[in-house]
Amino acid sequence: MVALSGRVFGKVDMATANVLVVAPDAAFGHSIAFALESGGFKVVLHRYVDEAFVSPDALDAACAVVDDDAIVDWKRSRELFDSFGKPVILLLNLLRSAPDLPVAKHLTKPFLGEPLIEAVLNVIAGQQ
């Protein structure tokens, strides 16, 4: 059991849990990073899924938070997400429908920080 900001959560060491944040819009990416860092996570930013999931940062990531605009080729999304091999929280625009991606939990934009932090905690804990 590990404490994160005074909370105990499963067997995951949240103090060292890296979250890969993928968003092409720098301001949005930094906003997501700020919310997650305030929840005690370490964050690594990338602009697009194709580069993020093959980067050295992907090896140390506990999960990824991906803006739907960061997916250049939706036809390859399942292959990319499967190759990442870790849980993904997919931030979806209200009007976009995503293909069925078993490793992805959907969170509709816009959202507040707390639902995102809870989603990250839940997907990381689900890996154990």
Task: List each language-model region with its residue ranges.
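Alpha4 helix (beta4-alpha4-beta5 surface) of REC/receiver domains from two-component response regulators
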Residues: 76, 90-109, 118
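Conserved phosphotransfer microenvironments
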Residues: 29, 60-85, 93-95
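A structural preference for short, hydrophobic beta-strand core positions in alpha/beta folds
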Residues: 45-46, 90
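Acidic, metal-coordinating helix/loop segments flanking the phosphotransfer/catalytic sites
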Residues: 46-63, 71
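Residue-level detector of anion-binding/catalytic polar loops
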Residues: 42, 87
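Short, structured coil segments at secondary-structure junctions
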Residues: 39, 84, 101-102
